[in-house]
Design a protein with these regions (language model features):
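Structural preference for beta-strand elements that scaffold enzyme active sites
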Residues: 7-11, 50, 88-92, 112-115, ...
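Conserved, mostly hydrophobic/aromatic
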Residues: 13, 43, 51, 106, ...
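Conserved anion-binding
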Residues: 15-27, 107-191
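Short catalytic helix/loop segments, enriched in acidic residues and glycine
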Residues: 25-45
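Glycine-rich, proline-tolerant flexible connector loops at the mouths of alpha/beta enzymes
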Residues: 50-68, 118, 185-194
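Catalytic cores of alpha/beta
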Residues: 90-114, 200-235, 250, 254-255
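C-terminal helical cap(s) of enzyme catalytic domains, especially alpha/beta-barrels
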Residues: 125-134, 229-232, 236-241, 245-262
Length: 262
C-alpha cells in the first residue's frame, strides 16, 4: 500500500493588480509586489500541481482583479500546453465568492475549482441552489472559516466582515445535506500567523464529514506538513501554503518531499 500524499496548493494573492507576498519573518515584515503571471509560473515550474489564486480586493470588498486573474489562468493553461508526461497544473480561484455576481465572475475565468466563501451561508437559499446545480461536478469547494468561541465552540465566520454564522456542527450538517463535496478549512485565528495549521479545527471537521478537506492557513514549518500528512488517511486531501513559503521557512521542493509528492 502506497504512503499517503498530501496535495500542496501554493497561494498567489492578488491585490491592486499585483501578486503580493510577505517579506521578513514577522507579522509586520511588509509586502513585496510581483508580476502575477511570473509569481504563479514560479510555482508551476517548481512542481506545483495546483495554484490557489486569490482576489484579495474582492475578498475584502475593495474592488476586483478579474482581468489579472484571467491572465494568470491563461498563462497556467499555456504552460500546461508545453508540459509533457505530467498531469496539467490546475487553478483554484478564491476570494469573495459569495453571491451570484461573484460566482459568475469567478466561473468566467474558466478555473478548475472555485472556492465559495463561508459568507455565502448568510444566503442559504442561494447557496443551496448553487450546490444543487453543481451536485455532479467537482467545480465548487466551500470555504469553511471558523473561530473558537469559549461559549459556543467552533463558530463559522467570514473574514473581512463582522458576520458570524452557525456553529460548526450545525453548518456541516446543513452543508452535507445541501451537497457540498469539498471544504477549504481555515482557523481564522491562525491564518497568516505562522502559528500552526489549526489542527484542532481540522480534527473536528474530519470527525464530522466524509467530504474531502483542504487545510488553509497557519502552516509554519515542515513539521506542520508532517502533521497534516498524517491526517490524509482520515480525509485530509491537501493544504494551501502561503506565508511560510514566501518568507523562506522552507522551500517548495522541501515541501513536496515531505508531502510525498516526489
Amino acid at each position: 500500500m502506497s504512503a499517503p500524499v498530501l496535495e500542496l496548493l501554493p497561494a498567489v494573492d492578488i491585490s491592486e493588480g499585483y501578486a503580493v507576498r510577505p517579506v521578513g519573518g514577522t507579522l509586520s515584515g511588509g509586502e513585496q509586489r510581483l508580476d502575477p503571471v511570473e509569481a504563479a509560473l514560479t510555482w508551476v515550474k517548481a512542481g506545483a500541481r495546483w495554484i490557489h489564486l486569490v482576489d484579495l480586493d474582492l475578498a475584502f470588498g475593495r474592488g476586483t482583479n478579474t482581468e489579472v486573474l484571467a491572465e494568470v489562468v491563461a498563462a497556467v493553461r499555456a504552460e500546461n500546453a508545453w508540459m509533457t508526461g505530467s498531469a496539467p497544473v490546475r487553478v483554484q480561484v478564491s476570494g469573495g465568492v459569495r453571491n451570484a455576481e461573484s460566482l459568475e465572475r469567478a466561473l468566467s475565468l474558466n478555473p478548475d475549482r472555485v472556492n465559495v466563501t463561508s459568507a455565502a451561508l448568510a444566503d442559504s437559499s442561494w447557496l443551496e441552489g448553487v450546490l444543487a446545480h453543481y451536485a455532479d461536478s467537482d467545480l465548487l469547494a466551500l470555504g469553511l472559516d471558523a473561530r473558537y468561541n469559549t461559549e459556543r465552540g467552533w463558530v463559522t465566520v467570514a473574514r473581512g466582515t463582522d458576520w458570524s454564522g452557525p456553529d460548526l456542527a450545525e453548518a456541516l450538517a446543513w452543508l452535507e445535506s445541501a451537497g457540498v463535496r469539498r471544504y477549504i478549512v481555515t482557523d481564522v485565528s491562525k491564518d497568516g500567523s505562522l502559528a500552526g495549521p489549526g489542527a484542532e479545527l481540522l480534527d473536528e471537521v474530519l470527525a464530522q464529514t466524509a467530504c474531502r478537506v483542504v487545510a488553509s492557513g497557519g502552516v509554519a514549518s515542515l513539521a506542520d506538513l508532517v502533521k497534516l500528512r498524517s491526517m490524509v488517511p482520515y480525509g485530509l486531501e491537501g493544504v494551501v501554503l502561503g506565508k511560510a513559503l514566501y518568507v523562506g521557512n522552507f522551500s517548495f521542493e522541501q515541501a513536496l518531499e515531505v508531502a510525498g509528492s516526489r
